[in-house]
Each structure stands twice: as C-alpha cells, then as structure tokens.
Regions:
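Signature of N-terminal electron-transfer/Fe-S-associated modules in redox systems
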Residues: 1-206
Length: 206
C-alpha cells in the first residue's frame, strides 16, 4: 500500500463489543484456518471505527492488528481490504451513500438519484464528502437488488425504487438525525411487481 494522504491513527485495539463478535466469528473456523475470517474481522474493525469516530473506515494499523490476530502476513490483509469496495481505506462522512450505477439502476433512473444526492446531500459528486461531514457519496458495483432499481445503500441499509423526490426526502430525514425504514420508496412488498396486481388469480385470458 502506498502512503496515505490522510492522517492514520498510531494505534488500534478492538474494544469489548468487537472482541465479543470476533470470538463468535472465530468459532466458525477450524484450527489453523482462522485466516479465512479476514473479511469478517475487517468488517468488525470498520464498524468499530464508525461507532467510535462517526467515520466507518479501516486504518492500516487495524489491518496490522487483524494480521497478527489471524497469523497472516499484513500484505495479505491489505490485498483483501483494497480489493473489496465495501471497505473504506480513508475516513468518510457520518453516512455512506453507496449508489449503484450499473445497467439496471441506470436504466431505472440512478442519474436522478445522483442528482438528488448532490442537491440534498451537499456532495459535489462521486467520491466527495459534504462540507458538514454528514455524507460521503460512492458509486458501487451491483448491489444485487436489480428488480427494485434504482438502489441507494446508506450505511448497511438498502433504499429501493427511488426517484429524485424520494431521495431528497430520504436525505433530509438523515439530516434531521432520523433513520428511515429501509425498503421500497413506493411501498412495494419485497420484490413483488410494482403494479397493483401481485398475485396470480387464475382469472382472465391465458
């Protein structure tokens, strides 16, 4: 890894809450195979940073701690952390806006969601953090919920079937300190059809 442009903490230690999660995670792996837990532990580290600093990211020193815990070379942890886009290698805003811009979401209006993120979230574009530190906007790969496109993942939650107005409403709620209920902005049940008919009635023409 190249030298970071931001300030890295000098030390990192998992707190009691994180240690309890790690103990549960490591029980899933047989002796000698604990290195397979690198992704879950990276996630635990990122969640701890978000909980304690209001910015969910993984400092290099945390990766070193994970490497020591799992008895693996630090470079192997760096490789995993930098490969997956869900791990943040630098500080981000309080809320992470993760916009899917792949084909289904693009065809269903992700550009309008992006415009709303700029207008209501105060970000200049993808990769930017708002001046108040509340939002960071990232464009991500497919989130796997294409039938509910367009999708905006905020932190760990999916907000689906969005348009410009519903995205503005969503971000305004976060600005007020609220946590809107995840799911469809149009009241769709799970991935059911968007129209009024969502069951097979057996009536009408074949």
């Amino acid at each position: 890894m190249s030298a970071p442009a931001h300030k890295e903490p000098e030390s990192f230690a998992f707190d009691a809450e994180s240690e309890a999660k790690i103990a549960t995670i490591l029980k899933r792996y047989p002796e000698g195979k604990q290195a397979s837990a690198v992704i879950p532990l990276l996630y635990v580290a990122q969640r701890q940073m978000g909980r304690l600093t209001q910015s969910a990211w993984v400092p290099r020193v945390a990766m070193d701690v994970i490497a020591a815990r799992l008895s693996m070379p630090p470079i192997r942890v760096y490789e995993v952390a930098t490969f997956y886009f869900m791990f943040n290698m630098k500080p981000i805003g309080r809320h992470h806006l993760q916009l899917c811009g792949t084909t289904p979401c693009m065809l269903r209006g992700s550009d309008d969601v992006l415009r709303a993120c700029k207008d209501a979230g105060g970000v200049k574009g993808v990769g930017d953090t708002s001046a108040d530190g509340l939002f960071t906007l990232t464009e991500v790969e497919c989130l796997g919920a294409c039938v509910n496109a367009p999708i905006l993942q905020v932190d760990d939650d999916y907000y689906e079937d969005l348009d410009y107005d519903s995205t503005v409403k969503l971000l305004e709620a976060f600005k007020r300190g609220e946590r809107p209920k995840p799911g469809s902005a149009i009241g769709r049940m799970a991935s059911a059809p968007a129209g009024p008919q969502n069951v097979l009635t057996g009536q009408g023409d074949d």
